[in-house]
Amino acid sequence: MPTINQLVRQGREVEKIKSKSPAMENSPQRRGVCTRVYTTTPKKPNSALRKVAKVRLTNGSEVISYIGGEGHNLQEHSVVLVRGGRVKDLPGVRYHIVRGSLDLQGVKDRKQARSKYGAKKPKAK
């Protein structure tokens, strides 16, 4: 424990807050190009084939991002919008791809939580 004199001379160092999505560089979203689209398996105890894409962002960094929703139309060289937000059961996936913007279409026949999946309001019959 420091003495009062040591604190007067040096002071306390403020702990820096570490970003959870460093590749975004303090932007809300970033545009990028898909370099690889593939599926991967989650860690225990979950079991599935999660859709992910490796994306090269406009700032040059390459990140792995998650494609939410059922079905997608992404291929290599698709231009996508990436936002922060990790996927708990996929290690290394710290970003999400925004549905319904740029080359990625919204989820088809989505009725609830549509804004999260870029789905238009269905026509009332």
Swiss-Prot record:
Residues 9-31 are annotated as: Disordered. GO terms for molecular function: rRNA binding; structural constituent of ribosome; tRNA binding. GO terms for cellular component: small ribosomal subunit. PROSITE patterns: RIBOSOMAL_S12 (PS00055). Signal peptide: none annotated. One of its GO terms (biological process) is translation. Gene3D superfamilies: Nucleic acid-binding proteins (2.40.50.140). It comes from the Bacteria. Keywords: Methylation, Ribonucleoprotein, Ribosomal protein, RNA-binding, rRNA-binding, tRNA-binding. The modification 3-methylthioaspartic acid is found at residue 89. With S4 and S5 plays an important role in translational accuracy. Belongs to the universal ribosomal protein uS12 family. Part of the 30S ribosomal subunit. Contacts proteins S8 and S17. May interact with IF1 in the 30S initiation complex. This is Small ribosomal subunit protein uS12. It comes from Verminephrobacter eiseniae (strain EF01-2).
